[in-house]
């Protein structure tokens, strides 16, 4: 089962926490769809800024959005000009007062989502999939990861039939709940179709093993 389930969802409440931090008795569905709309918009709008994750906190008619990114300068802009533009665009999607908090991801090589997006970008630039996977695995392990597994699925190398190839180095214990495993998914839009890229990154164990 550990092979199939989303590693972050599997560990929620154990060592991982939710990306949407709010509680609603009435308009739960409405707020959930609003969250999805905001996330999709930000992902598209800030695609080249290396956005790792987006956290949304809500309280009393206000929405605080935490954006974790590898390139905060691109989002903030000169004297915060870009942030103001972004706030106005987000205000159109929600009737709440929006606060933006930009946080830098100091080691993008240790962030599964950013690694997946990096591999996807390489595939779009027609770099051989094995080379792209190997390069990312090597650089991630160099930065101190305990293990990584990258899976590419689709018409690899323009082949007639789609297939799945994966490359792993180190340990990736999917069943161990105390194992801090980061998960990222990205899609490479190539001339042959879409290639899916999944990354599982093992950073070490969080809770000490019970004696």
Swiss-Prot record:
One of its GO terms (molecular function) is mRNA binding. Keywords: Ribonucleoprotein, Ribosomal protein, RNA-binding, rRNA-binding. Gene3D superfamilies: 3.30.300.20, Ribosomal protein S3, C-terminal domain. PROSITE patterns: KH_TYPE_2 (PS50823), RIBOSOMAL_S3 (PS00548). GO terms for biological process: translation. Residues 38-106 form the KH type-2 domain. InterPro entries: KH_dom, KH_dom-like_a/b, KH_dom_type_2, KH_sf_prok-type, Ribosomal_S3_C_sf, Ribosomal_uS3_bac-typ, Ribosomal_uS3_C, Ribosomal_uS3_CS. GO terms for cellular component: cytosolic small ribosomal subunit. It holds the Pfam family KH_2. The keyword Nucleotide-binding does not apply. It comes from the Bacteria. Part of the 30S ribosomal subunit. Forms a tight complex with proteins S10 and S14. Binds the lower part of the 30S subunit head. Binds mRNA in the 70S ribosome, positioning it for translation. Belongs to the universal ribosomal protein uS3 family. This is Small ribosomal subunit protein uS3. It comes from Citrifermentans bemidjiense (strain ATCC BAA-1014 / DSM 16622 / JCM 12645 / Bem).
